[in-house]
From Swiss-Prot:
Biological source species: Macaca fascicularis (Crab-eating macaque)
Catalyzed reactions: D-sedoheptulose 7-phosphate + D-glyceraldehyde 3-phosphate = aldehydo-D-ribose 5-phosphate + D-xylulose 5-phosphate
GO molecular function terms listed in the Swiss-Prot or TrEMBL record: metal ion binding; thiamine pyrophosphate binding; transketolase activity
Amino acids binding substrate: H37, H258, R318, S345, H416, D424, R474
EC number(s) stated in the UniProt entry for this protein: 2.2.1.1
Protein name per its UniProtKB record: Transketolase
Primary role: Catalyzes the transfer of a two-carbon ketol group from a ketose donor to an aldose acceptor, via a covalent intermediate with the cofactor thiamine pyrophosphate.
Keywords from the UniProt entry: Acetylation, Calcium, Isopeptide bond, Magnesium, Metal-binding, Phosphoprotein, Thiamine pyrophosphate, Transferase, Ubl conjugation
Location of Phosphothreonine modifications: T287
NCBIfam families xref list: PRK05899.2-5
Cross-link (Glycyl lysine isopeptide (Lys-Gly) (interchain with G-Cter in SUMO2)): K352
Domain of life: Eukaryota
Keyword Metal-binding: yes
Length: 623
């Protein structure tokens, strides 16, 4: 067999001993914690032993070294055995394992990146393989390095569609540096898994998706060593037949034990039984990696030149996004773009044309696209920008919230926002996206209103930690800013003001331009308004909003192409709550819209220039 050298009996026994030590540690940790998933750990003990102490190449004292092989524990509830591995490797003190799930410990119930050996948070099932695909794509096509990527999945999560999106992606892009290990332990959380131990069906499914699929006895270290040696030339799925709770007498392969630690007396007895099978306490040292990953610096990536727009010219911010991203791509070869088969609408096709080797077509699989981006961003190897219609990011909200838990630095651009897209109708209109992205921890939400602001938003997003969302629009609107205008996160702009302003009007994107048009008509009636462009909806420029409100008799009017819930109006209301003498009035979309021309829809839903002018007059009259 090509490249496979069977380990000698001493090495095989050492791997068996390692697997049993991992079992013992998992049982001890979960019993001490009074919670956790020891049976899910025990089914994977031999897999983890062979992976980390025979197959993988890594520096055990430097888990995030860029040359290391990568590992993703997609079945994140088996975290105790991952922690046990790193204690076995000498990175964690063994005593720390007994602090599992304690508030004072970094060993959370599921893997999180405050642990140096965890690249992506897992635990919401079905997402690990997508992240692993992103790592493998980066290794093969961007780093062109020899590190390999391994992902351990449970059989229960194979019901998740996102797993099969990732399987398809790996096959399309020939990720021969990727190995998925399927821990087929038969039992789910509350019932047996749908296929139980029908290994041939698992194999046929993987093969149908273009993978090399190998069935093994998941408790045979020899079969596992052999299978990992065969993982070449195409993405490989090692389909391991295992038993949940392996090695735990009276519990192995029994239902109703998921997520239950062993009682102390029972744990002590089982640990003695397992310990008696260990022949040597000698530990296997990790094999170091081949050091061929390039040095990468993604800090302080700046546009090569200022924007080149002319005030008054018209451009849609979605197109300005594509132009800006392509331009930023010339500043760093680590800027990458991903799209969900909408590149001719989001205009990421401009990036593809100028940087074809750094564009990843993810097709219509938005959940996987976000996971791919998360994987690409790990260990600061790339700066990913994903784009699709903003409405379609709602499908990937779980992946986005897990990206935040992963402390991932990814940028998402959502186009076709609001009723202003027109005739395509409500299924295409993003009207919930601001609420969604504002709720994500440590997120930054950009809402640029012209081409200059959009270009600045792209540059800022590339250098901002966390999840960045850029909301772009379909209609063409006028350039209102000079090319040398300075933009910063959390810094709003006063677009129009006078000493006689009576109301502060806050709009963004399309509605900012409607507010400016309303100001023109109101001026003819000798009514002046102050118009603010927030630029970022999160964080919001509270100081400028308050200063403007106080200069306009405490009156604020927000207008947005978004539902009332969670958008600009609620963000502004939260910012000024408790401030005396300030009132906030909202104009927003109040029901599910319909098809129509953009101007007709803006008018129908009361967010056009006429509605703004009428609301301003109402506020003044009310006083």
């Amino acid at each position: 067999m090509e490249g496979y050298h069977k380990p000698d009996q001493q090495k095989l026994q050492a791997l068996k001993d390692t697997a049993n030590r991992l079992r013992i540690s998992s049982i001890q940790a979960t019993t001490a914690a009074g919670s956790g998933h020891p049976t899910s750990c025990c089914s994977a003990a031999e897999i983890m032993a062979v992976l980390f102490f025979h197959t993988m190449r890594y520096k055990s004292q430097d888990p995030r070294n860029p040359h290391n092989d990568r590992f993703v524990l997609s079945k994140g509830h088996a975290a105790p055995i991952l922690y046990a591995v790193w204690a076995e490797a000498g990175f964690l003190p063994e005593a720390e394992l007994l602090n599992l799930r304690k508030i004072s410990s970094d060993l959370d119930g599921h893997p999180v990146p405050k642990q140096a050996f965890t690249d992506v948070a897992t635990g919401s099932l079905g997402q690990g393989l997508g992240a692993a695909c992103g790592m493998a794509y980066t290794g093969k096509y961007f780093d062109k390095a020899s590190y390999r990527v391994y992902c351990l999945l449970g059989d229960g999560e194979l019901s998740e569609g996102s797993v099969w999106e990732a399987m398809a992606f790996a096959s399309i892009y020939k990720l021969d540096n990727l190995v998925a290990i399927l821990d087929i332990n038969r039992l789910g959380q509350s019932d047996p898994a749908p296929l139980q131990h029908q290994m041939d069906i698992h194999q046929k499914r993987c093969e149908a998706f273009g993978w090399h699929a190998i069935i093994v006895d998941g408790h045979s270290v020899e079969e596992l060593c052999k299978a990992f040696g065969q993982a070449k030339h195409q993405p490989t799925a090692i389909i391991a037949k295992t038993f949940k709770g392996r090695g735990i007498t009276g519990v192995e392969d029994k239902e109703s034990w998921h997520g239950k630690p062993l009682p102390k007396n029972m744990a002590e007895q089982i640990i003695q039984e397992i310990y008696s099978q260990i022949q040597s306490k000698k530990k296997i040292l990790a094999t170091p990696p081949q050091e061929d990953a390039p040095s990468v610096d993604i800090a302080n990536i700046r546009m090569p030149s200022l924007p080149s727009y002319k005030v008054g010219d018209k451009i849609a911010t979605r197109k300005a996004y594509g132009q800006a991203l392509a331009k930023l791509g010339h500043a760093s070869d680590r800027i990458i773009a991903l799209d969900g088969d909408t590149k001719n609408s989001t205009f990421s096709e401009i990036f593809k044309k100028e940087h074809p080797d750094r564009f990843i077509e993810c097709y219509i699989a938005e959940q996987n696209m976000v996971s791919i981006a998360v994987g690409c961003a790990t260990r600061n190897r790339t700066v990913p920008f994903c784009s699709t219609f903003a409405a379609f990011f709602t499908r990937a909200f779980d992946q986005i919230r897990m990206a935040a838990i992963s402390e991932s630095n990814i940028n998402l651009c959502g186009s076709h926002c609001g009723v202003s897209i027109g005739e395509d109708g409500p299924s295409q209109m993003a009207l919930e996206d601001l609420a969604m992205f504002r709720s994500v921890p440590m997120s930054t939400v950009f809402y640029p209103s012209d081409g200059v602001a959009t270009e600045k938003a792209v540059e800022l997003a590339a250098n901002t930690k966390g999840i960045c969302f850029i909301r772009t629009s379909r209609p063409e609107n006028a350039i209102i800013y000079n090319n040398n205008e300075d933009f910063q996160v959390g810094q709003a702009k006063v677009v129009l003001k006078s000493k006689d302003d009576q109301v502060t009007v806050i709009g963004a994107g399309v509605t900012l331009h409607e507010a400016l048009a309303a100001a023109e008509s109101l001026k003819k009636e000798k009514i002046n308004i102050r118009v603010l462009d927030p630029f970022t909806i999160k964080p919001l420029d509270r100081k400028l909003i308050l200063d403007s409100a106080r200069a306009t008799k405490g009156r604020i009017l927000t207008v947005e192409d978004h539902y009332y819930e969670g958008g600009i109006g609620e963000a502004v209301s939260s910012a000024v709550v408790g401030e005396p003498g300030i009132t906030v009035t909202h104009l927003a979309v109040n029901r599910v819209p319909r098809s129509g021309k953009p101007a007709e829809l803006l008018k129908m839903f009361g967010i056009d220039k006429d509605a703004i002018a009428q609301a301003v007059k109402g506020l003044i009259t009310k006083a």
